[in-house]
Regions:
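Short, structured motif recognition centered on aromatic/hydrophobic residues
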Residues: 121, 141-143, 154-155
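Short Cys/His-rich "knuckle" micro-motifs
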Residues: 42, 51-53, 81-83, 153-156
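Ferredoxin-like iron-sulfur electron-transfer modules
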Residues: 14-35, 48-68, 82-89, 132-142
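Short histidine
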Residues: 15-16, 150-162
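Iron-sulfur (Fe-S) cluster-binding modules
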Residues: 1-24, 89-91, 95-98
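A short, structured beta-strand/loop element
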Residues: 38-46, 50, 118-133
């Protein structure tokens, strides 16, 4: 594991990124972007174990299963890429969880309201701070509606604890 700069971090704010690697797959976790929607650990609990440290154990499933699960992440908190020499078919690693995924422009952005939870934004979107600085550009954004988040305007899962 290592720390690095988050490429989608808020302007001027250093965020932590954790790296998990095998010979065939590199997984990045940006904890400050995570809304704790639980898609990862509900889909692949043998890899994503929130109660353990480290909480990601890549040996628990095939790289292809991990890739499919990361592609379900609604916040871009989990990302992946294939290292040089990976045996994984590159065509399988083109989804929204890929570090190389390009956000395609859409005509409409879809915003879903979660009962007693956040707003799920799907589609090419950009979020700007009050000074006009771009703080996030993504195809998956989860916005806080409860006001408890420590990562405004993004949901950090704080509503689960009230």
């Amino acid at each position: 594991m290592m720390n690095d700069e988050n490429p989608t971090a808020k302007t001027g704010q250093r965020q932590v990124v954790k790296e998990y690697q095998t010979a065939d797959l590199i997984v990045y976790w940006y904890p400050q972007q995570c809304s704790h929607a639980s898609k990862c650990w509900q889909t692949l609990p043998q890899v994503f174990k929130p109660e353990e440290r480290p909480w990601i154990t890549l040996s628990g499933a095939t790289p292809e299963e991990v890739i499919k699960t990361i592609d379900l992440c609604p916040t871009d908190a989990l990302k992946y890429k294939l290292p040089e020499g990976s045996k994984v078919d590159p065509a399988l690693a083109q989804g929204p969880g890929s570090m190389d995924f390009k956000v395609a422009p859409t005509d409409f952005i879809k915003i879903n309201m979660v009962k007693s939870g956040p707003l799920l934004v799907k589609g090419s979107a950009q979020i700007y701070d009050p000074e006009g600085n771009l703080i996030k550009k993504s195809n998956h954004i989860v916005l806080c509606t409860c006001g408890l988040t420590a990562n405004r305007p993004f949901c950090d899962g704080s509503h689960y604890h009230r």
